[in-house]
Amino acid sequence: MNTTHATPGEQSLHTTKSVDGLSRTLTKGLTAGVAAGLIVLVPVLILQLARGIGVVPEMQLAASSLMGMAAYEGAAGLILGTLLHFFVSIVPALAYGLVASRLPVVNRLAWIAGPVLGLIVFFFMGIVVLPHSAFTTPASVSPMPYVAALLIHMFALGLPISLIIRRR
């Protein structure tokens, strides 16, 4: 039986490269998630202002998944909703970054993979997260139209994540 053993120096070099690669992937994912979270706010703000709602109730709406109607009272709902908003953009970006680092085809198809990521996030939120939460809205706040929310997830969340992660 022929086994090849790496010297301690070679093992250390391999481990360092692995840690550096993972660190770079996580940094890109975090950057992409924060950027996409900010980018998403632009069309959301425009659409909500056009509907006479504003961005504060949109963030409170996100917080209502954990707080129920209490999310619409005071600043706690706004703060928690904003944190949840960025959580929902950072986690998929980190996952996408890990997949893209293992499957180079994902980076080559970023213009397709990004909107697909947005679809996945949209449907995951709608099918898994929201039905199992305390999500609620007062009569004065109506959720964003379905198609608008879907397109925002595809092109303001998924696409920026894929393009930022694709950059070398």
Located regions from the model:
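N-terminal signal-anchor transmembrane alpha helix
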Residues: 20-52
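Internal alpha-helical transmembrane segments of multi-pass membrane proteins
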Residues: 27-29, 101-124
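Membrane-interface interhelical connector segments
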Residues: 51-73
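Short, Lys/Arg-rich, polar N-terminal cytosolic tail immediately upstream
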Residues: 1-22
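Aromatic-anchored segments of alpha-helical transmembrane domains
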Residues: 37-41, 118-128
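Hydrophobic alpha-helical transmembrane segments
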Residues: 80-97
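Hydrophobic cores of alpha-helical transmembrane segments in multi-pass inner/ER membrane proteins
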Residues: 91, 152-164
